[in-house]
Regions:
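An alpha-helix initiation/capping motif
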Residues: 48, 69-73, 77, 265, ...
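Gly/serine-rich nucleotide phosphate-binding loop at the start of the catalytic core
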Residues: 1-74, 96
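Stable alpha-helical structural segments in soluble proteins, enriched in small hydrophobic residues
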Residues: 30, 34, 74-86, 380-395
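Generic detection of short hydrophobic beta-strand segments and adjacent strand-loop junctions
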Residues: 3-11, 138-148, 212-214
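Acidic carboxylate diad motif detector
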Residues: 51-168, 303, 307
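Positively charged, helix-rich recognition surfaces that bind polyanionic ligands
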Residues: 3, 169-415
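Short amphipathic alpha-helical coiled-coil/interface segments
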Residues: 24-27, 75-83, 249-257
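Surface-exposed helix-capping loop/turn segments at secondary-structure junctions
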Residues: 39-43, 88-95, 277-281, 324-328
């Protein structure tokens, strides 16, 4: 399987940065040339101009000659792919399977813009990535060398993408590399249920009664700080009558997104490592249809709602589970927080078309505390995670019913 590593390109000299920026601009020019040829051919003939025909037209182009041939061909292939999607949708329209109003021809990139450089043939020299040049470009420009991340040493790199950000004020580099799937022989009779929340990002409970919480208050803090500073910047913008997003706002958003991405990656790794260390072969994750939740954090400056990207956490878990041979299941989680696990309440599925009221044996008596019909107290999120595990029907829960209690959950703070 393939994994992707993202980094910001740093430690370039001024000449190297200018060269990279120029290459990205040339790539944009070639992209627009390729788009122009296909569009004009379609307008005249109502047919599709194939990749091979477009290549024959452009191989002597000035922009094509300035780029390394592999890099130039990757650009033509990407343009070809976008138009194939367009013509595929046209076929669906003819068959009455798609709305004609939603289809648009691929547009040109901005004249002064930049686009992604795709490197399909990776050349390394002393653990440095050497950006491939054409013979023509090499005569007049100094080579660009980017240090390879230590984690990729010895790995087979399939593709590298260099993506201009904020009108090429900086570049992001994405390495796609191959890893072997380590299929561990884990016990499929052991399962871990996960209930997603806000203060407790992940509440994890096993069918043997062990439990732990991954703290989510740090994510709230990151979002809260972002909203506070962004509100100040927005106020300054409004006074100066600036309509577009400012560079300071973009930097602030990028920092916030990077911190959240890092936090979720570490949280997913903690969960999967726990399964590997405790011979747990199945993970069941509770989910909502939109996989987003809103929370009122009781503050001002447009901070009433915080969006946490649970979908990213889900995808990271799926990826890691596939890598190590842990079976992963998404489980619809309606009423799992209201039903009582130890009372064996039936857990219905919420129907938007026909919503109904249900009565359950237990109830939440305090924030974070659930009481069963016989007065036993249990962590409310643990009760939800257990019901997610029960609703999935993937593991036997008789041990828990016989015990009638859980271990006290341990809170894990991600650093």
């Amino acid at each position: 399987m393939y994994l992707t590593l993202k980094q910001q390109v740093k430690h370039l000299s001024k000449k190297e940065f200018r060269n990279l920026k120029y290459l990205s601009h040339i790539a944009k020019n070639l992209t627009n040339e390729a788009i122009y040829n296909i569009r004009q051919y379609y307008f005249k003939n109502k047919k599709y101009l194939s990749y091979n025909e477009n290549y024959k037209i452009l191989k002597n182009s000035e922009n094509y000659k300035k780029l390394n041939s592999n890099m130039a061909q990757q650009i033509l292939k990407e343009v070809d792919g976008s138009f194939k999607s367009f013509f595929g949708l046209l076929k669906l329209v003819k068959n009455g399977q798609y709305d004609n109003k939603k289809i648009k021809l691929p547009k040109y990139l901005a004249k002064d813009g930049f686009t992604t450089l795709v490197i399909g043939f990776v050349r390394l020299k002393d653990d440095m990535l050497i950006i491939p040049y054409s013979n023509l470009f090499r005569k007049t420009h100094k080579e660009i060398a980017i240090k390879l991340p230590p984690v990729l040493k010895g790995k087979k790199i399939k593709e590298i993408r260099i993506i201009p950000k904020q009108h090429s004020r900086y570049f992001e580099i994405q390495y796609t590399y191959e890893v072997k799937e380590v299929q561990r022989e884990l016990n499929k009779e052991n399962g871990l249920g996960i209930d997603l929340g806000i203060d407790n990002l992940c509440t994890c409970v096993t069918n043997n009664g062990a439990s732990f919480l991954i703290d989510g208050r740090k994510l709230k803090s990151i979002n809260r700080y972002y909203n506070k500073i962004n509100a100040k910047l927005q106020s300054i913008k409004d006074k100066q009558k600036i309509e577009n997003t400012t560079l300071r706002q973009k930097r602030l958003a990028r920092k916030r997104n990077n911190r959240i991405e890092d936090y979720l990656s570490k949280a997913a790794r903690i969960i999967v490592n726990y399964c590997l260390n405790n011979d747990i072969g199945r993970i069941v994750l509770g989910y909502n249809e939109d996989f987003q939740r809103n929370s009122n954090i009781g503050s001002i400056n447009n901070q009433n709602f915080v969006n946490i990207p649970y979908g990213k956490l889900r995808d990271k878990l799926i990826h890691l589970c596939k890598l190590y041979g842990v079976e992963f299941k998404l489980q619809e989680e309606s009423y799992t927080s209201k039903a009582s696990f130890f009372d064996g309440d039936e857990i219905p599925i919420y129907d938007k078309e026909n919503p109904q009221e249900y009565i359950f044996s237990g109830k939440r008596i305090k924030r974070g505390l659930y009481q069963t019909s016989v007065g036993k107290l249990i962590n409310a999120d643990c009760n939800g995670a257990l019901n997610i595990l029960r609703k999935s029907k993937v593991v036997d829960l008789s041990i828990l019913y016989n015990r009638g209690e859980l271990n006290t959950p341990k809170r894990i703070r991600v650093v």
